[in-house]
Regions:
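N-terminal intrinsically disordered/low-complexity leader segments
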Residues: 1-8
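Helix-turn-helix
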Residues: 12, 20-54, 58
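Alpha-helical DNA-contacting segments of helix-turn-helix folds
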Residues: 56-63, 70
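Hydrophobic alpha-helical connector segments
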Residues: 58, 72-99, 152
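Amphipathic alpha-helical packing segments from all-alpha helical-bundle domains
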Residues: 65, 69-72, 115-150, 177
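Secondary-structure edge/capping motif, primarily at the C-terminal ends of alpha-helices
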Residues: 71-78, 105-112, 163-167
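Amphipathic alpha-helical segments used for helix-helix packing
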Residues: 95-117
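Hydrophobic/aromatic-rich alpha-helical bundle segments in the mid-to-C-terminal region
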Residues: 106, 138-181
């Protein structure tokens, strides 16, 4: 869906949909709930989005673009920050359960069979993020391997799973420091 342009009202529905899917999941939130929460009628919803599947696709594309903007701001425009601190900011941004990556992470598990386009959006973001992490690792260590970037991505996702199962926030920090020590 290149050049996604939405009317203001439709964009408000997308923002609310992102919030609903973030907390309720893709299968538990139906069109009726979206319509009720956003106070648009079903006809308007289907006029804007045509189906729940397309609505989910649009929500994930919007979320992916927002997150990519945040990542680019960290790695490209923050010139006063060291590479290690940039990697740490990326790690913290992506392991925040209230943050934008959580929805894309959730989509990997919940959309593969039912919403394949949405699943592909989440997978494409993971690939893009791996490349961004790799470019930062190369600045840190010339002989860094692409697998190092994948390991950090797996650590991000492992930290999310750990946070979902417990309240050990300090473990997240310790895990990142372990990665840096192993890289050195």
């Amino acid at each position: 869906m290149p050049n996604l342009i939405l009317p203001t009202r439709a964009f408000e529905v997308v923002k609310k949909g992102i919030d609903l899917f973030h907390y309720g999941g893709f299968h538990m939130v139906g069109v009726d709930k979206i319509v009720r929460e956003t106070e648009v009628n079903k006809m308007t919803f289907y006029n804007y989005f045509h189906s729940k599947e397309r609505f989910i696709d649009i929500c994930l594309i919007v979320q992916k673009e927002r997150l990519q903007d945040q990542v680019v701001a960290i790695v490209e425009y923050d010139h006063d920050t060291s590479t290690i601190d940039k990697l740490k900011k990326l790690y913290i941004l992506h392991t925040d359960l209230e943050g934008p990556y959580y929805l894309l992470f959730k989509a990997i598990f919940e959309t593969k069979n039912s919403y394949p386009n949405a699943y592909q959006t989440a997978v494409r973001y993971r690939t893009w993020l791996s490349n961004e992490i790799y470019s930062q690792l190369r600045l840190l260590k010339n002989d860094a391997a692409f697998n190092d970037a994948k390991i950090l991505l797996y650590m991000i996702e492992g930290a999310i799973i750990q946070l979902l199962s417990s309240e050990q926030v300090d473990q997240k920090e310790r895990l990142f420091n372990y990665f840096l020590n192993a890289l050195a």
